[in-house]
From Swiss-Prot:
Coiled coil: none
Changes after translation: Two-component system major event consists of a His-to-Asp phosphorelay between a sensor histidine kinase (HK) and a response regulator (RR). In plants, the His-to-Asp phosphorelay involves an additional intermediate named Histidine-containing phosphotransfer protein (HPt). This multistep phosphorelay consists of a His-Asp-His-Asp sequential transfer of a phosphate group between first a His and an Asp of the HK protein, followed by the transfer to a conserved His of the HPt protein and finally the transfer to an Asp in the receiver domain of the RR protein.
Domain of life: Eukaryota
Full protein name: Two-component response regulator ORR32
Role summary: Functions as a response regulator involved in His-to-Asp phosphorelay signal transduction system. Phosphorylation of the Asp residue in the receiver domain activates the ability of the protein to promote the transcription of target genes. May directly activate some type-A response regulators in response to cytokinins.
Location of the Response regulatory domain: 13-138
Gene3D superfamilies the UniProt entry points to: 3.40.50.2300
Protein family: Belongs to the ARR family. Type-B subfamily.
Amino acid sequence: MEDMLSFFSSGLHVMLVDDDTKNTRTATKTLSMLHCPVVSTHTTACAGLRTLSGDNMLDVQTVLCDVSKVVSSGFDFRRVNETEHQIPVIYLLSTTEPEQMVAGEDAEFLNHLLLKATYILRKPLDWATIALWRVVAWHRCCLEERVPGDSMDDIAAHAGAGGEDGNDDDVVVIEEPQVHFKLVRSRGSRKRQLTINVDSGSSDSADANQRKKIEHMNDAKGPVGQHVASHLQLPAQEYCTKQQKDLDERRLISSDSLFLKAIFPTLNVSPSSPLILAGGAVPTAFIPRVGMTVNIGKAPMIELPFGVPVDDFLVGETAYGGAGPSIGAPSNDAAVAYAYTGALNNNTAVGSLMAPPIDEPTFTLTDPIVGTKGEGVVHIVITSEDQNALAAVEAGAPNNAEPFMMPDQVDLEEDIMFSLESLLGLDEDMIPMEDAGGEAAEGSLNIGEGGMEIGWDLDLDDILMNNTNEFAFLDDLAWIE
């Protein structure tokens, strides 16, 4: 008795929840003998919980409740009281078997309540066998100090989850799926709502939203998933840089000549430059021809058709005259300067786009060169009198059978070297224009009153380079008759 009074000086105050009147009277008498006065009795668990939650709450230190009343209420009465009020709940069990009390889903709920119970007493109570105060003292100590005991390992509910109005005293979160009710206080002005904490995590809402976005992106499949992943993982600046790089890169196509494929990687050419051969087909109305235009005092310019390999037209052709293909060119500049030939009109000097000469030319030109003189520009037209010979030669030349037939692809990674003589067409033996006799002299250029004639039979050693990177001819190489 002294030990009990050391814990409960005024005795152990008990609340009794039972609808059996006879058992209620018997239990009240027995508890009084054990210095455990009954301060309140209720017939339902909801009524008892309403009393404990009211403003004029009695000094109750433990609750004795018939387990059948808890089953009929539909919620775990013990867990709610021990979590919110730290009041131990002891179940009262009748002499009948639990399986005979309820059936179906209620039987499963009953087994759950008995398994998680703090303490169970059989009815009727026997004052000689029970030591109620020891059980209550120990369990209250565990609840107040939050020290989990063997029977408290399942208590994970916590109070203080803020409501909509920010009042933490009105909401208690309980991890129990059977708790689905609202408890109204006696004065009616404040409500206490019991909810279920379905989210055991305590992460921030922003982190949760970001995690949901990432999970949604990972779950998405197909084009939609790829689109979302690309926009989330690829910054805008990096995306624009990649697009610009793709636009700047220029790939060699099949219509490029062997010479352009070899030297193009070393050139810094803009994507919009006319040197970029877009691969368009030459109109069938225009037959690919070679035209030469000579300006007074300037080196002759060669007009090449667009999209046709250079080496197909320059087989046996040299920079400053000599053997060449017997392909006629129209004397009218308007017919020559169509859209495809204008691409290479205004580029570098003669021979800058000339392919290396072939050791064995397919055919040579034996007809004399006919020259005409005018006040402005002198046009030299390469013609052939024998058209049948021209047709025979063209039929026998495999490279000219198909104007757009391209040579084998060249690996751009290989080192291809071209000598200056090859680029200028000076590695072949030049035929001086005056060596052709009177006809050649008659067809040569007679410029000025003095009839100055320039011979084009030059060697590389006879050409000097001045500081302006231009060719300078020695004075003794040009003579006046």
